[in-house]
């Protein structure tokens, strides 16, 4: 046994992070990495992030070029607008934003949660398994965005996440 590794028989966890109170912080600005393993440039591994925000992404969108985001809200709901349409995600629900998909997040107050990012494969619906129709992963339990579009001629800021770093560009919408 490695003497430098502390082993504990009790459950270990961290307390929730404080939501921002000084100024407006949107979803991307409030994204903080907690842990990770692997390398997004090699397309293998994962990362765990937390998000802490109190403001919507106005005229700002994000693209994750590294991997898929599985978002788990813990406090406050997320109104996510994707290229495929809107998704409203509340605490107790999860959502997936796939690699390369543009999105923006609107919030109605202090919001926090966790994100699992995978770099190698994509999230998929689980197989029904031996329980079949009585399983816990029926297609009817999964929602998807309903197509919606807006016609506007405005300048937007696009934040790209690539190789674990953020890059910003301007785009007319």
Would you name each region that the model predicts?
Residues 1-173:
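Jelly-roll (double-stranded beta-helix
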């Amino acid at each position: 046994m490695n003497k430098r590794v502390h082993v504990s028989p009790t459950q270990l966890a961290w307390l929730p992070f404080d939501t921002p109170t000084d100024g407006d912080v949107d979803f991307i600005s409030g994204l903080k990495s907690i842990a990770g393993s692997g390398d997004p440039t090699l397309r293998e591994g994962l990362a765990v992030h937390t998000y802490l925000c109190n403001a919507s992404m106005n005229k700002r969108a994000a693209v994750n070029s590294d991997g898929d985001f599985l978002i788990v809200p813990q406090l406050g709901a997320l109104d996510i607008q994707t290229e495929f349409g809107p998704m409203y995600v509340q605490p107790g629900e999860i959502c997936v934003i796939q690699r390369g998909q543009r999105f923006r997040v609107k919030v109605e107050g202090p919001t926090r949660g966790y994100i699992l990012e995978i770099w190698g494969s994509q999230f998929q619906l689980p197989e029904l398994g031996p329980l079949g129709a009585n399983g816990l992963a029926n297609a009817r339990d999964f929602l998807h965005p309903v197509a919606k579009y807006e016609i506007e001629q405005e300048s937007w800021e696009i934040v790209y996440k690539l190789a674990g770093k953020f890059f910003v560009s301007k785009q007319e919408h």
